[in-house]
């Protein structure tokens, strides 16, 4: 399966290492790079992570914007300028940069949340707050998916 699913909470050690869930690594294993691309989310106070193929799709979408527009500059700066390639160690862990941990408020635990083509890494309590909001919105908008053909 090529989809990031489920939610996992893993500990972050004193060296900022965290284990990426095995099924996420299996999805990423189909990529050319043995690791993950991570960048600060522009939607939430979390880290977004994906494989190189998704970064290529983002690049194609951003390239459709006017090359001199503020929007394109902002997307290129926030996604490509802030992105880091995190390699897996022998135990399936990555080292989270302090800048990304600070952006997401991550200290001792990280909550991995599958979002289909990407996954997010949250501070667990912040994700629980976000989940409550998402549940409300999903319930209110549940009929939207009916017409999503």
Curated annotation (Swiss-Prot):
The UniProt entry, under InterPro entries, shows: MraZ, MraZ_C, MraZ_dom, MraZ_N, MraZ_sf, SpoVT-AbrB_dom, SpoVT-AbrB_sf
Where in the cell does this protein reside?
A: Cytoplasm, Nucleoid
Q: Mainly resides where?
A: cytoplasm
Q: Which keywords fit this entry according to its UniProt record? A: Cytoplasm, DNA-binding, Repeat, Transcription, Transcription regulation
Q: Which Pfam families match?
A: MraZ
Please list the GO terms describing molecular function.
Answer: DNA-binding transcription factor activity; transcription cis-regulatory region binding
Question: Which superkingdom is the protein from?
Answer: Bacteria
| Domain (SpoVT-AbrB): residue spans on this chain | 7-54, 83-126
Q: Which GO terms describe its biological process?
A: negative regulation of DNA-templated transcription initiation
GO CC field: cytoplasm; nucleoid
Subunit structure comment from the entry: Forms oligomers.
HAMAP family, alphabetically? MraZ (MF_01008)
Protein family membership: Belongs to the MraZ family.
Q: What is this protein called?
A: Transcriptional regulator MraZ
Organism of origin is Rickettsia akari (strain Hartford)
The gene that this protein is the product of is mraZ
């Amino acid at each position: 399966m090529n989809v990031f699913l489920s939610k996992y909470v893993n500990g972050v050690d004193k060296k900022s290492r965290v284990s990426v869930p095995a099924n996420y690594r299996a999805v990423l294993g189909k990529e050319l790079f043995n690791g993950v691309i991570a960048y600060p989310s522009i939607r939430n106070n979390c880290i977004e992570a994906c494989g190189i193929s998704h970064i290529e799709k983002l690049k194609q979408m951003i390239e459709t914007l006017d090359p001199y527009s503020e929007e394109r500059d902002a997307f290129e700066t926030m996604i490509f300028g802030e992105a880091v390639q995190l390699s897996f160690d022998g135990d399936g862990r990555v080292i989270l940069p302090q800048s990304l941990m600070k952006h997401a408020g991550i200290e001792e635990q990280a909550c991995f949340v599958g979002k289909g083509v990407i996954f997010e890494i949250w501070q667990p309590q912040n994700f629980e707050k976000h989940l409550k909001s998402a549940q409300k919105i999903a319930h209110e908008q549940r009929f939207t998916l009916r017409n999503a053909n």
